[in-house]
Each structure stands twice: as C-alpha cells, then as structure tokens.
Design a protein with these regions (language model features):
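Thiamine diphosphate
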Residues: 1-112
Length: 112
C-alpha cells in the first residue's frame, strides 16, 4: 500500500483523491515521506512544480547525505499563467540537479 502526502492542488485532484495526509508545505510532505521510507513503506509525494524550491533543502540536507531513496513524486508542471512561467522552464533542470528520477510529470495547460 502506497502512502500519499502533499499540498492540495486542484489541477491534479483526480489523481490525489486517496491522499493520506494533506500537508501545509512541500517540505513537510517530504519529511513525512522520509520517515515512511525509513520504516519500510513506499510513499508518494505530490505537488505543483512551484513547490520544488521548497524541497531543495530537505533533499540536499537529509535525503542525499543519508542516502535515503527519494519517494515517488507526482509533479504538476505549470508554465502559465505568468507567475508559473520561469519555474516551468527550470523544473526539469532542478530535478536533474537533485538527481531525482522517480517522477511522474503531469504537464498542465492553462485555459484563459
């Protein structure tokens, strides 16, 4: 049984109906997931790509140095409206720098 954690996102709500814990931040979801991994569970974390900046510290100061495998990540990638455009462009670069490979990237279009 997979455990799901993350910050609520209306764009992927059909994929996260069975969430175990709605978190107040992306780093909180990643911290809970780390504990689950250490307990032998297989968690999944979901977030919008705008939340990637919030998980950089926990990835580089907890997951990477202690060689904790990353949880599966369901990532909603948005490039519009305007305030999402830059993060949308650098999302894949950030994931590569973090050496994050266990990802499902859900591209989102924006209808105005």
């Amino acid at each position: 049984m997979k455990l799901k954690f993350g910050v609520p996102c209306s764009k992927i709500k059909d994929r996260i109906n069975d969430v175990d814990i709605h978190c107040s931040s992306e780093s909180e979801a990643m911290a809970i997931a780390a504990g689950c991994i250490l307990a032998g569970k297989e968690p999944e974390v979901y977030m919008q790509n705008s939340g990637l900046g919030h998980i950089v510290d926990i990835c580089t100061s907890l997951y990477m140095p202690y060689e904790i495998p990353y949880p599966r990540l369901l990532l909603s990638r948005r490039v519009k409206p305007h305030h999402h455009s830059f993060m949308g462009k650098i999302t894949e670069d950030i994931l590569k720098l973090l050496q994050y490979r266990n990802i499902e990237l859900v591209n989102q279009s924006w209808k105005e």
